[in-house]
Every structure is written in structure tokens, then in C-alpha cells.
Curated annotation (Swiss-Prot):
Induction text: By nitrogen starvation, and arginine. Induced at stationary phase by sigma S.
Gene behind this protein: astD
Entry keyword set: Arginine metabolism, NAD, Oxidoreductase, Stress response
Pfam family, one: Aldedh
Domain of life from the UniProt record: Bacteria
Enzyme Commission number: 1.2.1.71
Source organism per UniProt: Escherichia coli (strain K12)
InterPro entries linked: Ald_DH/histidinol_DH, Ald_DH_C, Ald_DH_CS_CYS, Ald_DH_CS_GLU, Ald_DH_N, Aldehyde_DH_dom, SuccinylGlu_semiald_DH_AstD
The keyword Disulfide bond belongs to this UniProt entry's keyword annotation: no
GO biological process, one term: arginine catabolic process to succinate
Protein name, UniProt field: N-succinylglutamate 5-semialdehyde dehydrogenase
A GO molecular-function descriptor: succinylglutamate-semialdehyde dehydrogenase activity
Pathway(s) served: Amino-acid degradation; L-arginine degradation via AST pathway; L-glutamate and succinate from L-arginine: step 4/5
Amino acid sequence: MTLWINGDWITGQGASRVKRNPVSGEVLWQGNDADAAQVEQACRAARAAFPRWARLSFAERHAVVERFAALLESNKAELTAIIARETGKPRWEAATEVTAMINKIAISIKAYHVRTGEQRSEMPDGAASLRHRPHGVLAVFGPYNFPGHLPNGHIVPALLAGNTIIFKPSELTPWSGEAVMRLWQQAGLPPGVLNLVQGGRETGQALSALEDLDGLLFTGSANTGYQLHRQLSGQPEKILALEMGGNNPLIIDEVADIDAAVHLTIQSAFVTAGQRCTCARRLLLKSGAQGDAFLARLVAVSQRLTPGNWDDEPQPFIGGLISEQAAQQVVTAWQQLEAMGGRPLLAPRLLQAGTSLLTPGIIEMTGVAGVPDEEVFGPLLRVWRYDTFDEAIRMANNTRFGLSCGLVSPEREKFDQLLLEARAGIVNWNKPLTGAASTAPFGGIGASGNHRPSAWYAADYCAWPMASLESDSLTLPATLNPGLDFSDEVVR
């Protein structure tokens, strides 16, 4: 029984599904998808639970969320192993994900009060108040790269605001989704407040098509995000928050410490086996001898990266990709770039057939025309050389995406120019592209999102503002507008 609907674990009535470890092939999870009727059932449960949950005081909702945080802490080792085994990422990285889940709760509580709490301004004849109210029933679509942390970034602020939720994890990480749901169950979340439906495309389409849905919060690919945007077009009454991918540029302009710059680049391009939406996909490198030396060192260090299993000792920097198919897609993308005229610098290698263990790839595309403006979700870095910084910024902005952008340079003036001209929601200076602060908004523009950033700003799309003018008594104004006569004279 792998669906959680209205406080009960039930068996899915849709297609059967098996999840295996992408490296070892070990069976980790088996179950059935939710069919359309069960998705409807989950929506009815969420709708029925909404009035009571929304009417609880914030302190009461907060208490449930804090119990969930305590359970994350006490079950950290177990949840770390589940995420690592299911995604293929090393244990050390899965542990950082669970830590991020715990930290996100305190940040979400603070953001609730700062961004969507209550404010009151006294006026001579009363007060002006600002309150926030929950939307109602929200669908949350989770991604596979951070199956705990990223859905958590939607679910926690949505619950704090008083919404009820239907959560669909990625079909590639059903075990992680179920494990997190069981912790919410232990935390004492009332029936119907959070419902879990497993499944792939058909389940997702049934969920997004629900008429009685008040909104949808999505993290995933641009292609799916565009489909959801089209599906919900003409429905302005529904809140839609899309957090999508990127074709992110990293500009290497001047390098004082080559190894430090190489380390930053590897952290930007290859951490999580390149499966972060903020990963550097395009390396823009200044022409010249210094750039040549940097590139040679980058290739030399990158070719030492050997992906391994989640529990290997010593721990590898990267593990496998989410699936063998995902790894093959990266290899295919590399082959297409090479066929277009790209200059191979480091060829990606699938270490073992039937696994997702893929080494990084680096290819130079300077002067090659028609390179697709697409996100390759894996450890593949394309390199372009440039002559002037103005040219580098033009190249950085030459994409339909706009998630992250970075600059390596000792010159503050160049960063200031980039801040003015970059088309990206995250712009970093001498920091990895994959670094982001939860106390700041997380999101992009263009094909990277619909201007609904998450993290610190997630509270914004989880509640709507209600403005009020208030007075505890009613008196006739001492001064009336022209044309108003409240005298006792009788009009004849």
C-alpha cells in the first residue's frame, strides 16, 4: 500500500511500478500508480480537510511542522540512505539534503512572519490591516534530483499558510516520497491535509487537470513546466509556481588561483553528477594563455572524478545518474555536439553497462553554429572562448533560460556590470553556480520559471493578501463631502 489518502495507506489502482537502485539494480520499491479516480479521491480529502486546517491557529500548524522537523532529525540516517540508494548520489550528499530539509523549516517559519504574516497600521479613525489567507487545495509536483528537499520547500510553507496538499513525487523517486510521507504521518498531520499519490505522466495529468484544484507548485524540466502552463492557461484563479531548468553560464574572466577556479567550476558543473538545475552548462572562458592553463587544469582534475556507489568507501564526489537512460541521454548529447564540430576535451564514459555511472564530459564549441539551447541534465560542460567582457555577457544572455549565472574575477566593477546586464535570477561572484541561500529567493526568468521564486519567497505563492480598513465603532464624520446634507431640516 503506497498511496496515502485521507489518513489511510491504500493500494494504487494504476500501472505497476518498480524502482531499482540505478547503479546496483537492487529492487528498492514496488507499488502501483494512483489512477484518475484515486487522484480525485485525494482532492476530495484535501478539500474536506481544508476548512478545519485553515482555521487552526498558526501556532497549532507550527507545532505539527516542528514535530516533523524533529522526526527528520531522529530519522536522518535512515532517510539519508533511502535518498542515496534511490537517486544514486553518495551518502555524504544525501545527508546534506536531509540537513537542508531540517533547516528549511526554520527558514520557512521566519519567512511566513516576515513576508505573509499580519501587519496593522493605526489610523486616526481606526486601523489598516494586512492579513494573508491560504489558497485552498494545492498540488505539489516533486523532482527526482532532490526528492526530499525540493518538495519540502513547497510543502512546508504551504502547510504553514493553511493549505492542504496533494503531493506527487517523481515516478523515479517513489520510495523517498513515501518515506517522507510516513514522517508526516508520525508528526500527527490530520487526515486529508497532506495526501500522497504515486505515478508518472498519467497520474500527473489527472492531478493537474483537477477542476477543484486551487493551485499547482512544480519543480522540474522546462518542457513539463511549459505543458503545465498551457494546461492551466485561462485559469487565473489558480496559483501556478514553476521552478524549471537552465542553460547556465559560468564566466571565467581573470584567475588569480587556478586550482581555486577549477574547484569552483567542478562544484558548479559536476556536483550531483550534473543533476542540479543551477549547474553550469556553458563555460565562457577568456581567450589567452591564462585561459589555456585553466582549461588544461580543469580537464586534468575532472578526468580523475570516478563516480561510485552510494556507500563506497572512501566516498566518491559523484554517484550515478538517476537512471541508465539518463546517462545514455548525456552520452548521446555529447555525440551530437561532437558531430556538429565540437572539439572533445574530455569524453564521458559509462563505466559499466546496465548502470548509470558516467564520468564527466567537456567539449569546446567555440565557433560552432547552431548549438541547441537546451539543458543537458548531467555531467556535460560545453566551453566557449571570448575576447572581451562585453562579448562574454552577450554570450551568457544568449539563451531562452535565465536561472543562474556566475563570474570568476577579482574585479568588482565587472561583477557590477554583470548584475546590471545579466538575465538570470541567481547571479554569483566567485561562488559556485550551485550555491544558493535559503534566505534569498530561488528561481529564474525566461524558460526557467514564471516569476514565482521559491525558498525565502515561497511564502508569497502559498497565501494571498487580504487588506482591511477597520474601526470598532461607527460615527458620522465631522466634515462631510460637498453635496451631503445630514441636517434635521425637512426637505419640501
